[in-house]
């Protein structure tokens, strides 16, 4: 798997169990409803080990900049803070969010390809959400 495969604009086309995932990680009801109604587009740019990911939606636009394998401070769209590390393992991009506050919950976000779709799973505890994107 080449990191270059991820480069481009990706539009959300399928979403399963996303609200349950958001509830598991502690996102409030109003923000959960808004996030579930949004149909985000991902803009991904890669330069060597440095990645730049914009998530664009009517809910909120966010930017994530990171270097593969290097821990960084991450603030989620709803304001939760994590120590995060993103790596490539077995052809998948694995994003580990480790909580800073005891009231938050760790998550693992994994991205890979199935045919022409970019698949994303979000897992916290036993709750797993699956989302699929297609290239714009």
From Swiss-Prot:
Alphabetical list of PANTHER family matching this protein: FATTY ACID BINDING PROTEIN
List of residues binding a fatty acid: 111, 131-133
SUPFAM superfamilies recorded: Lipocalins
GO biological process, one term: fatty acid transport
GO MF term (any one): fatty acid binding
Keyword hit for Zinc-finger: no
Keyword entries, A-Z: Lipid-binding, Transport
Membrane-crossing segments per the record: none
Family: Belongs to the calycin superfamily. Fatty-acid binding protein (FABP) family.
Cellular compartments per GO CC: cytosol; nucleus; perinuclear region of cytoplasm
CDD domains from the UniProt entry: FABP
Protein name as it appears in the record: Fatty acid-binding protein homolog 5
Organism per entry: Caenorhabditis elegans
InterPro entries xrefs: Calycin, Fatty_acid-bd, ILBP, Lipocln_cytosolic_FA-bd_dom
């Amino acid at each position: 798997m080449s990191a270059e495969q991820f480069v481009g604009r990706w539009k959300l086309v399928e979403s399963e169990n996303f609200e349950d995932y958001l509830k598991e990680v502690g996102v409030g009801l109003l923000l959960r409803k808004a996030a579930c109604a949004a149909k985000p587009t991902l803009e991904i740019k890669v330069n060597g080990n440095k990645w730049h990911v914009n998530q664009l939606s009517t809910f909120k636009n966010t930017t994530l900049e990171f270097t593969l394998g290097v821990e960084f401070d991450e603030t989620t769209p709803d304001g939760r803070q994590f120590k995060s590390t993103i790596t490539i393992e077995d052809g998948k991009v694995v994003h580990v969010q480790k909580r800073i506050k005891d009231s938050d919950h760790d998550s693992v976000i994994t991205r890979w390809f199935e045919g022409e779709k970019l698949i994303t799973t979000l897992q916290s505890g036993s709750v797993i959400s699956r989302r699929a994107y297609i290239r714009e």
